[in-house]
Design a protein with these regions (language model features):
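Acidic/polar loop patches that form or flank catalytic/metal-binding clefts of enzymes
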Residues: 35, 48, 164, 220-221
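Rossmann-like flavin
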Residues: 79-179
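Active-site-adjacent bridging/hinge elements
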Residues: 15, 179-184
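Generic, well-ordered alpha-helical scaffold segments in large soluble proteins
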Residues: 3-6, 152-156, 168, 207, ...
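Beta-strand segments within the central parallel beta-sheet cores of soluble alpha/beta enzyme folds
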Residues: 13-15, 68, 163-169, 210, ...
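Helical element adjacent to the flavin cofactor pocket in flavoenzyme catalytic cores
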Residues: 185-221
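Conserved active-site and cofactor/substrate-binding residues in soluble primary-metabolism enzymes
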Residues: 47-50, 144, 148, 199, ...
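N-terminal glycine-rich phosphate/pyrophosphate-binding loop and immediately adjacent elements
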Residues: 1-114
Length: 221
């Protein structure tokens, strides 16, 4: 899309009969399913724009997609022992964690603040592409970004249920917290709200293709 916007002649060859790859939907009976999208991070708010929103705005597609704020991150269900909806809003999320370990209330807040701090450094990597990446500009990434996530979490939290709640969502990354780099863990738990997309992920792909063709690009299926 950037090439097309710069005036280049661009041909996109797609093996499927619709655009999008993992960003597609399909219909079975009365239901429409998303192929891969569970929730979309990085949209943020008007006051605090996320990195994904910034990219969509740069590509002139943000206003062509309708985002719906998501109230729950996920629900944990352990046999018949526990059914726990995990809220997406920061205050409610922290309150849920603290209810299982009141004695670690302050440490839970400190750990979440650390998650958000390293996430902000992660976001700035995009803003400073082409700039100098060093320990002065990105101290947390250099200091603890490559340490195992569980090792960092152990320094703040001891309660196994709180650790479990923090670890469940990381299944989407396919790497357990004991070896997952902390940078990816902290980035995943920067609670700047998640969103669904009206029409599913296909709406994102369709908006990108529409803008691509508007800029002179050609798509062949």
């Amino acid at each position: 899309l950037n090439l097309a916007k710069s005036g280049k002649k661009v041909l996109l060859l797609e093996k499927h009969n619709i655009p999008g790859g993992c960003g597609t939907t399909f219909i079975r009976g009365r239901y429409e399913f998303d192929v891969g999208l569970h929730t979309l991070w990085g949209i943020g708010t008007d006051e605090k724009k996320g990195h994904v929103r910034k990219i969509f705005e740069e590509l002139d597609v943000y206003d062509k997609i309708e985002f719906i704020r998501q109230d729950e991150l996920y629900t944990i269900n352990i046999l018949d022992k526990l059914e726990l909806p995990i809220p997406f809003y920061k205050d409610k999320f922290l309150a849920t964690l603290q209810s299982f370990s009141p004695e670690e209330k302050d440490n839970i807040i400190k750990f979440q603040e650390l998650n958000e701090a390293i996430a902000q450094e992660f976001y700035r990597l995009y803003d400073e592409l082409g700039g100098e990446i060093n320990s002065e500009n990105f101290p947390l990434i250099f200091e603890i970004g490559t340490r195992p996530a569980m090792e960092v979490m152990d320094e703040y939290i001891k309660n196994p249920i709180v650790k479990m709640i923090y670890s469940v969502y990381l299944g989407t990354l396919g790497i357990p917290p004991k070896i997952l780099p902390y940078l990816l863990f902290g980035f995943s738990y920067e609670m700047n709200t998640g969103h669904h997309v009206k029409g599913g992920a296909q709406s994102i792909s369709n908006a990108l293709v529409e803008e691509f063709e508007r800029c002179g690009g050609t798509v062949m299926y």
